[in-house]
């Protein structure tokens, strides 16, 4: 028995090493994971309260339509409930959209590097993938527009972008939306939206009324700290969302996920405190990079991408031996960089000291051979 030919060209997603695995392999008692862009401050205390109230519902199927959460999210965003599509994390939302829109003979346009699942699901559905290199770490919308034709079903824009943390400015996005064919669905993946504080970062929700081919993705996994529960959503044209609902599994988001997302949404004070502390953490890294002349991308997310002057895989291994798990840029095709999730202040302090050691050692090596 053979699967689709295109599946043979892909690899299953392999997450980074887990904490217990690293402890065993390196004989360490303390591990700090700064590789998956999780919220180091956890989630709202209201989430724990919500969990305690669910014991009597474990044997029951969840509300497939997620009515209560849908209503509250719609109210929070200022959109209609019918404009929302919920999924088991944005991974499932991306899968649903790809399954519904793509097939052999169609294509998608995206940046490179960016979030890998856009490419993954396009290939599974038999669509061609047109990747456009980032320009100075940012989506090159002009070059992406040149790749769009009458066969283009989706244009993916990860904003802010993973893995660089950079963003597309408002005016550039507006110009792109005016120019791109209406037959192509422009999807703004805003998984890190809550962290984006730049003045010219585009507020896309008000654009939905004018641009019927615009869709926005957001999640509870990042700033809300609910990665374990897997829940995200799309916001878009009411008619298209209704059609996509057909591709959604009947009970795709659990009662637990819906309940904790609702609780987290109601605690905006906790969210804003996380965003504030994250900004402070980013500035710890900025100060280090400027002092040690380390290249970095200014970030609108809860992570930073930087280049230490050594291969990313080497930096990854050496930091892991010290108890710090980061993400090598090699995973994204940027072999001389690493991506680091902003952690607690003391975690940032500790890993920055390790980064200083790596930079100083590299400088000494270069001086020796010069």
Swiss-Prot record:
Positions bearing N6-(pyridoxal phosphate)lysine: 222
So which cofactors does this thing need? Answer: pyridoxal 5'-phosphate
Could you confirm whether the keyword Transferase appears in this record? yes
GO terms for MF: histidinol-phosphate transaminase activity; pyridoxal phosphate binding
Q: What is its EC number?
A: 2.6.1.9
Q: What class of enzyme is it?
A: transferase
Q: Which reaction does it catalyse?
A: L-histidinol phosphate + 2-oxoglutarate = 3-(imidazol-4-yl)-2-oxopropyl phosphate + L-glutamate
Instruction: List this protein's GO terms for biological process.
Output: L-histidine biosynthetic process
Question: What highest taxon heads this organism's lineage?
Answer: Bacteria
The pathway that the record names for this protein is: Amino-acid biosynthesis; L-histidine biosynthesis; L-histidine from 5-phospho-alpha-D-ribose 1-diphosphate: step 7/9
Q: Say which family it is in.
A: Belongs to the class-II pyridoxal-phosphate-dependent aminotransferase family. Histidinol-phosphate aminotransferase subfamily.
Assembly and partners are described as: Homodimer.
What's the protein name?
A: Histidinol-phosphate aminotransferase 1
Gene this protein is translated from:
hisC1
